[in-house]
Amino acid sequence: MMRSHYCGQLNESLEGQEVTLCGWVHRRRDHGGVIFLDIRDREGLAQVVFDPDRAETFAKADRVRSEYVVRITGKVRPRPAGAVNPNMASGAIEVLGYELDVLNQAETPPFPLDEYSDVGEETRLRYRFIDLRRPEMAAKLKLRSSITSSIRRYLDENGFLDVETPILTRATPEGARDYLVPSRTHAGSFFALPQSPQLFKQLLMVAGFDRYYQIAKCFRDEDLRADRQPEFTQIDIETSFLDEADIMGITENMIRKLFKEVLDVEFGELPHMTFEEAMRRYGSDKPDLRIPLELVDVADQLKAVEFKVFSGPANDPKGRVAALRVPGAASMPRSQIDDYTRFVGIYGAKGLAYIKVNERAKGVEGLQSPIVKFIPKENLDVILDRVGAVDGDIVFFGADKAKIVSEALGALRIRLGHDLKLLTCEWAPLWVVDFPMFEENDDGSLSALHHPFTAPKCTPEELAANPAVALSRAYDMVLNGTELGGGSIRIHRKEMQQAVFRILGIDEAEQQEKFGFLLDALKYGAPPHGGLAFGLDRLVMLMTGASSIREVIAFPKTQSAACVMTQAPGAVDAKALRELHIRLREQPKAE
């Protein structure tokens, strides 16, 4: 081998030993006739010293520059007193170099590797192979590897089988757009890249592989946000003959073991919260429990007020009026309130009412707000008591359709928690359970809240009679306001699956066309089964403290779903298109 040690492995126990290092020149310094090279590899940095006594080697060291690839042999020795660097794993020692081979030269990188505050993300992605040399970027990918190793080890030890499922499959309605792949041998037909291995893992349960897992690539052609990529990685798990409590117990223990092994963080038993409670108290089905702010319903106190902004939603069965108390924030300037008003507008809110509680003992005179004149004093007192308002607080109000109020105040709660530094702890995991089976679309039709293969907590007859109130056997693990993973008990009887399809407007012909293979499988002794999938990229993002999943993926796409490094997607030649039976239409020019 070309090296004896990684740079980050060097320490005082190797004092006096000869070592050979391979890596990149991170930094070069010339101090009074002595040359120092900081050599970098994936494990860290090591300081190598060259003195003029070895003239040939010293001359080579004098010629090297940043990012040259080098091989160095030398002897480990303690650093002089006062020269120890506590910020480096190898900071107590240095290597006295006596052999230096330049394995390759390097041009000056397009950006410095020691700081990148002024480097645009597109430049970093264009030269990702250089960006990944940064110690902090390498650390994220190393942690990702540790995470997948821990998960594989746990699942292997618990009897799970790692089984691969197809990448080329057929399009099924799973919520997002599919990436389509034209078939050369079947003219006019297309494969789809899988949005998840959902149906294949269910078929593996029918086949008798009762504990399956896969670290799977998934693909969704959707609009991108900070936590989305067109291709992403899923920790996919499915089991037979286990109920919700069993599956949640196995996967919860996996996550607790993972955090202990990788970050030395211990979680207690995860609390459970229903979907209804999460939406009511936090305005989100993935609540961030680190933030000690809650939404409080006050519609009952505002039904009779003349202020239609409040009384309208308060009397609407589909409306909601909720309050959000922020302790000690009554001094918030109007400009900040206006900023928050614009913020909730993103979620459909038409405004943001507020009351500043300056001195409650003075009654209405001690309140600062444009809305108190519309609310009778007795109702106002009930509202302020209910939210726990005291002097120095500000109370925000949302009034609209329930969905808009929950989403707007829920998002405001998160924003306030971070802006005002209200977080009470570093980690707050929980399970959210008892999700609705369906959600109502704007046209009144129903769509599956999770996916159409989730089992309901009722019979097919009860489901058909009142689908809008049916609850599902679904469960999500949430951490710090982010959905880590979601799963459910699946439908394993054909009649129930067809009942769900009918509610979703999928008739018999479409059922057979798109899901005939699944319905066939359910006829041949499908066992009770269920599972869960974790988003690996999100998990790594949280565990590394990264701001985006692009920071924890080796070669991510941009927010426009492109790779600026390889220039993908790109054009293909006419011959390849003909073989695929595809003809491109010229796009009309914009006037």
Curated annotation (Swiss-Prot):
The keyword Coiled coil does not apply. InterPro entries: Aa-tRNA-synt_II, aa-tRNA-synth_II, aa-tRNA-synth_II/BPL/LPL, Asp-tRNA-ligase_1, Asp-tRNA-ligase_1_N, Asp/Asn-tRNA-synth_IIb, AspRS_core, GAD-like_sf. L-aspartate binds at residues 174, 220, 450, 490. GO terms for molecular function: aspartate-tRNA ligase activity; aspartate-tRNA(Asn) ligase activity; ATP binding; nucleic acid binding. It catalyses: tRNA(Asx) + L-aspartate + ATP = L-aspartyl-tRNA(Asx) + AMP + diphosphate. ATP binds at residues 220-222, 229, 483, 535-538. It is found in: Cytoplasm. Pfam families: GAD, tRNA-synt_2, tRNA_anti-codon. Keywords: Aminoacyl-tRNA synthetase, ATP-binding, Cytoplasm, Ligase, Nucleotide-binding, Protein biosynthesis. GO terms for cellular component: cytoplasm. It is an enzyme of class 6 (ligase). Residues 198-201 are annotated as: Aspartate. One of its GO terms (biological process) is aspartyl-tRNA aminoacylation. Belongs to the class-II aminoacyl-tRNA synthetase family. Type 1 subfamily. Aspartyl-tRNA synthetase with relaxed tRNA specificity since it is able to aspartylate not only its cognate tRNA(Asp) but also tRNA(Asn). Reaction proceeds in two steps: L-aspartate is first activated by ATP to form Asp-AMP and then transferred to the acceptor end of tRNA(Asp/Asn). Homodimer. This is Aspartate--tRNA(Asp/Asn) ligase. It comes from Azotobacter vinelandii (strain DJ / ATCC BAA-1303).
